[in-house]
Amino acid sequence: MDAASGAPLLTQPERLERRLKEIPAEPGCYLMRDCDDRILYVGKSKALRSRVRSYFRSRHDLSPRIRLMTRQVCEIEFIVTDSEAEALVLESNLIKNHQPHFNVLLKDDKKYPYLCITWSEAYPRIFITRRRRFRSPLDRFYGPYVDVGLLRRTLFLVKRVFPLRQRPRPMYPDRTCLNYSIGRCPGVCQEKISSVDYHRTLRKVAMVFQGRSDELQHLLQEQMERYAERMDYESAARVRDQLQGLDQLTADQKMSLPDSSVSRDVLALAFDERLAAVQLFQMRAGKLVGRLGYTADASGLEPGLILQRVIEEHYSQVDSVEVPPELLVQHALPQQKLMEDWLTEQRERRVQIHCPQRQQKADLIELVQRNAEFELLRAKQGQEKQSLATEDLAQLLELPTPPRRIEGYDISHIQGSDAVASQVVFIDGLPAKQHYRKYKIRSSSIRAGHSDDFMAMAEIMRRRFRRWARAKAEGMDVGALRHKGGSALQTDGLNDWPDVVMIDGGKGQLSAVMEALRELDLHEDLNVCSLAKQREEVFLPGESQPLESEPDQLGVVLLRRLRDEAHRFAVSFHRQQRGERMKRSRLSDIPGVGPKRVKDLLAHFHSIDAIQLASIETLSKAPGVGPALARDIHDFFHPSDEGTDADARAALEEQPQELSA
């Protein structure tokens, strides 16, 4: 039965029992969907029927998070696999693809940065990114790195030690730039170095980010000696300079262990009845090269299971080169052999998991545990501070209970062009980025030269709450949510009712929002306020004067954080949209390239920089591009010296940097 046409299974005991009987007692994965056919949760088991039945048999043993989830389940799907190991891999892929809301065990709000090398390109780029989007199976992400400042410094030094491509696009179409003249770039833009030799240089760079600096130094030392034996002193001096630069790079690493040949990851945690803080130390060739921290819901979970979930989460997100040959864990894992087999498959070489009890390895576990205890204390103090802020906000807005889910909205445009809006969500006083939403303003009245923030904000409110308006029209008691707390009555597939809606603006924006909510018949059901920038004043609907408040009181500070985050998110989306429009309009200037061909070119090459660097032969292989058009595109970006168009050259230099970097 289609989930979208049904009701929650808990309200239909007979249908629930029939559905549970249909599930086989085989290994595999299960997917729980709500009444809007959205995936709520993905899980795995070696016996699907008993595992899924456990969610509905003794619900008092479930955590509050899972109890809330089961109330929304309208359909259960399953995928049978040959083994539990296959189920683990499938579960990881399904979670990565669908990102179900209730699979968020790890509540770490950081998105750690990675270093990306685009090995699929003839002259690979190397850059820092927080988005792991594989454009090719050959591209590699190294990390994640907890200290983005150290990562930036390392990349800066690497580009000084090794001659690397310094720019995402050429500065000049027909000659090299200053970086080539001073030896910092090998002249990639004019193909002064072959693709094979450039890849060889980048393989050395990759060793730095794999924690193999000692091995690289040994290789460079041998290379320098070979050059010296052949009396190629210029090349030997260049390698000597690289060795000296590597010494500066390795000086940044925090600590070393006596066994300098071992690479391993070490996991330990500290926890109380509600919260767990997990630390993962990355040791490469005996040196600590990275440290990652996670917080998790610990209610009703054994410490070994928490560590296992962290392992599943972390290693499903990294490349095989980032999986070490050994993991040390503080507590035995419930499925340790399964985890070893899965990691071995990920790494394509044997991986062992140990729970050490004595000597040096146990000392290392103790060190990581001490760090976890500090992180647990810090997390609890942060929770207490956020709790005080939500209590103060409840008092300020005269709410019956502290708000759990708070939403903030903002508009961004330049005189009406590329108008967008943002929706950011704070849960328990902290950003919940998985719930953020971006909107493109659709109103034809808002365009370049014609802006209307009031109309834009009203449009977003209609689009955000129209499902709730439908539910109210069909008989749902939406008004009860205002007084009992949104999370208490989230049913029928609707689980995103906010306890507070905050608008960035003053009385004008607030009035426009309330008029839109009045059209939806929700104006009396939502708690709405606005925050004016100039004096940090809080306004409520129907009130001509702002609330009596201080800019530095905890509740107002929470609203300011929400407002600033909504503004940041809206501006970043606006810049992205404007950049994409500029790219499209730039390509549209080429004769014979219309809107559809622009779309096809960007889909094939992924960025305007790649189109600009492509040869005529490469361009001609793109869908819908023949030899003649390929030459026109190439000539547009590489005009001849005799007929250089100054305006085209100036426009070329004004192209936006690619967004993924």
From Swiss-Prot:
Residues 214-249 form the UVR domain. Residues 636-661 are annotated as: Disordered. Keywords: Cytoplasm, DNA damage, DNA excision, DNA repair, Excision nuclease, SOS response. SMART domains: GIYc, HhH1. One of its GO terms (cellular component) is cytoplasm. It holds the Pfam family HHH_5. One of its GO terms (molecular function) is excinuclease ABC activity. InterPro entries: GIY-YIG_endonuc, GIY-YIG_endonuc_sf, GIY-YIG_UvrC_Cho, Hlx-hairpin-Hlx_DNA-bd_motif, RuvA_2-like, UVR_dom, UVR_dom_sf, UvrABC_protein_C. Its main location: cytoplasm. GO terms for biological process: nucleotide-excision repair; SOS response. It is found in: Cytoplasm. Residues 636-652 have a biased composition (Basic and acidic residues). Residues 25-104 form the GIY-YIG domain. Interacts with UvrB in an incision complex. The UvrABC repair system catalyzes the recognition and processing of DNA lesions. UvrC both incises the 5' and 3' sides of the lesion. The N-terminal half is responsible for the 3' incision and the C-terminal half is responsible for the 5' incision. Belongs to the UvrC family. PANTHER family: UVRABC SYSTEM PROTEIN C, UVRC/OXIDOREDUCTASE. This is UvrABC system protein C. It comes from Synechococcus sp. (strain CC9605).
